[in-house]
Design a protein with these regions (language model features):
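Short, solvent-exposed cationic patches
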Residues: 236-243
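Acidic, glycine-enriched loop/beta-strand segments at the rims
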Residues: 77, 102-113, 155-160, 168-205
Length: 243
């Protein structure tokens, strides 16, 4: 058994996925909007939303991160007030009529996060898409800054293993994950005490600092903490023959 994990307590997903029933969004956001036009169907959808809001931590902690115009950066409770409404269920419906908001919902807890982080079968990941959650730009820096250096949950050696070779071995990524002759040369040079995760839920794409020199497929992509403009990344496919 294997798993991967990012080091944040909030999930990130579309409002339609988080706060409407699966049957209502079957076929995508356009199909959902068509169903909402029918009063009987709309009433059925709204009847299921309160429990979904509760399961995501409540309107006061559901954070709108992207794709919602002036509502970006607000909680669902704040957006409800801005819309002149009192019920967050009605706010969900109003927002989904014209937008496709993306949410951060705080559904995890630190104890569980740390418990799984210690497991040898759990690897590092971001699970991130651009501009919606700090995990995309901050996961590895957050692991080093908080869980290696501050809280001592992981040793630096364990962090490196779960972020490199273990991933390459699990996914059969030939020539990756290890520094050795004939490999692709993906190398990150840093001092752990300098690494900072700068991304936040309000500013999810603030880049980490402290990864002073980064080599991607043999080309220098970051030098002295500055991007060089190199475009040396490539699609990585499963391979079983080691390079």
């Amino acid at each position: 058994m294997t798993a991967d994990q990012y080091p944040y307590l909030a999930s990130g997903l579309a409002m339609s996925s988080a706060l409407t029933p699966a049957w209502a969004r079957d076929g995508g956001i356009k199909a959902l909007r068509e169903r909402m036009k029918d009063p009987v169907t709309l009433a059925k959808i709204k009847a299921e939303i309160p429990d979904m809001i509760y399961e995501r931590g409540g309107a006061e902690t559901i954070f709108i991160s992207k794709r919602a115009g002036d509502f970006n950066g607000m909680t669902l409770a704040e957006a409800t007030g801005k819309l002149g409404l009192t019920d967050p269920v009605d706010a969900v419906i109003e927002l989904l009529k014209t937008m496709s908001p993306y949410l951060n919902t705080f559904v995890a807890n630190e104890e569980d996060l740390v418990n799984y982080m210690k497991r040898l079968w759990v690897m590092s990941c971001t699970d991130g898409s651009v501009g919606t959650h700090p995990r995309a730009a901050g996961s590895y820096a957050e692991l080093i800054q908080t869980y290696v250096m501050q809280k001592k949950v992981l040793t630096l050696e364990r962090f490196v293993r779960r972020s490199t070779g273990q991933v390459a071995d699990t996914y059969h990524l030939a020539g990756r994950g290890y520094i050795k002759a004939g490999g692709y040369a993906d190398i990150n040079i840093f001092k752990p005490e300098e690494v900072r995760a700068n991304a936040s839920y309000a500013n999810p794409m603030l880049l980490a600092t402290g990864f002073r020199n980064v080599i991607v497929n043999g080309q220098i992509a970051v030098e002295n903490d500055q991007y060089t403009g190199a475009l040396s990344g490539m699609v990585i496919r499963r391979e079983t023959n080691k390079k």
